[in-house]
Every structure is written in C-alpha cells, then in structure tokens.
Amino acid sequence: MSRLPVVALLAAAGRGTRLGGPIPKAFVTLRGRSLVERSLRAMLTSEVVDEVIILVSPDMEDYARELLTRRGLLNDPEGVRVRLVHGGGERADSVWAGLQAIDHDDAIVLIHDSARALTPPGMIARVARMVADGAPAVIPVVPVADTIKRVDGSTVVDTPNRADLRAVQTPQGFLLSRLRAANEKFFATPDPGFIPTDDASLMEWYGVEVTCVQGDPMAFKVTTPIDMMLAQRITDEAEPTIFEVPGD
C-alpha cells in the first residue's frame, strides 16, 4: 500500500499583536526570520511533509508572498509544494478553509501554529509517523509543571491531579477524512455546545480517540513579549547548530 501524502496547514491568519509590533505575530522577526518562516522551515526539514498550506489573512497575502518568495520558499523548496490560502476570522474558520483547499481525499494532515517557531523537526516527524501507524488523531504533549486550579469566578472549585494533566502543543496530526468529517458536522450544527480551542478537542467532540506522543519544551508558543525574549535568548545561544537549515 502506498504511503499517504502528508499536508501541513500552517496557521498564520491571526491578528494577534500582543508582541507589541505593528504586524500580526506570525510575521514578527526572530533573529532575522519571521515566525511563520521558521515554522515553515521546520516542516521542510522534518522530511515527512509533502505540501505546506500557509493560512494567511487576505490583507497579509501580498506581504507573505513577497517575503517567502524572497527567501526562496514558494518555489517548491526541497520538492515540497508550498502555497498560500486565505484563512478566516477565527482559527477554526482558517483550518476549515485549509482542509477544503487540500486536493487529496486521503492524506495525513498536520495543523501547526506558526507562533511555535522553534518546534524541532523531529517532533513534527514523530506526530506524522504515529498517524501513519494507524492513530486517527495525535497530539504532542508535555507534563504540566504548575498546580492547576478549577475556579468559579474567584472561588476555587477543585484541584485536578497534576499527574493526569498535560499541556498540548502543535503540530497536531489527523487522518484527513476524519478531520474533514468532524469539521463538516461542527459547522453544520447550529449549536454544537462548545468552542473548540484546538483541533483535537473537535475530534474528541466527534467521538474520535486522540493519542498522545511526547512533545518538546522548544515547541512553546511565542505569544507575549516575555515569550519573545526567551526565544531570542535561545536562538542567540543555539543557532546555527540546531535551528538553522543545513546549507543555509
């Protein structure tokens, strides 16, 4: 049986400006490269991805196209097809637009936040391979360090056992047919009763078992100025040894 193609959806359509810059955080630069570019390079370096669809807002399409063209990343780098697709107002809308843009009926789809710009390529491959081995939905996770409280307003309700908790990262991997079906049902349901905070929660709602694999501390999300300071410190000390693409 032939290998399923692997298509990555790279979410970069958000309007988040919590990093304090004038442009969406996906296009903020870290050591000379935008977060979206770093995430794209990690996908290419993983050696498991056949196509990358970058989800951008319509008003950022020209900016993204010029940036990635100048970097040589829109001309099938390393034999991987890379293209831009308009995202929606919410993350779920963007993912649905990306799923509709995939040409295949059967594939493995990886959904990744561009703000997780230091995600190791090996972790990307680990997620994709677990789906290829038969798991319909896979998420990378790391242990929770802090004690978590469930609250009602300002009152503590209970304290979940920290040993049972995990922080979830991306990329999350899925069988395309199952994820499409879950999205179709969600968007066709007038009141689904919840707002999915990630794609795995949508699959849980749809009744699909979600499998965990080991995540990586480097796959943290660059959201606030403090996150950016940490990312800058890491890349200042670690590059070019572990994050730069060989031969760059």
UniProtKB/Swiss-Prot annotation:
Pfam families: IspD (PF01128). One of its GO terms (biological process) is isopentenyl diphosphate biosynthetic process, methylerythritol 4-phosphate pathway. It is an enzyme of class 2 (transferase). The record marks 18, 25 as: Transition state stabilizer. Its EC number is 2.7.7.60. SUPFAM superfamilies: Nucleotide-diphospho-sugar transferases (SSF53448). The keyword Transcription does not apply. The record marks 162, 221 as: Positions MEP for the nucleophilic attack. One of its GO terms (molecular function) is 2-C-methyl-D-erythritol 4-phosphate cytidylyltransferase activity. Keywords: Isoprene biosynthesis, Nucleotidyltransferase, Transferase. Pathway: Isoprenoid biosynthesis; isopentenyl diphosphate biosynthesis via DXP pathway; isopentenyl diphosphate from 1-deoxy-D-xylulose 5-phosphate: step 2/6. It catalyses: 2-C-methyl-D-erythritol 4-phosphate + CTP + H(+) = 4-CDP-2-C-methyl-D-erythritol + diphosphate. Gene3D superfamilies: Spore Coat Polysaccharide Biosynthesis Protein SpsA, Chain A. Belongs to the IspD/TarI cytidylyltransferase family. IspD subfamily. Catalyzes the formation of 4-diphosphocytidyl-2-C-methyl-D-erythritol from CTP and 2-C-methyl-D-erythritol 4-phosphate (MEP). This is 2-C-methyl-D-erythritol 4-phosphate cytidylyltransferase. It comes from Corynebacterium efficiens (strain DSM 44549 / YS-314 / AJ 12310 / JCM 11189 / NBRC 100395). The lineage of its organism: Bacteria, Bacillati, Actinomycetota, Actinomycetes, Mycobacteriales. The gene is ispD.
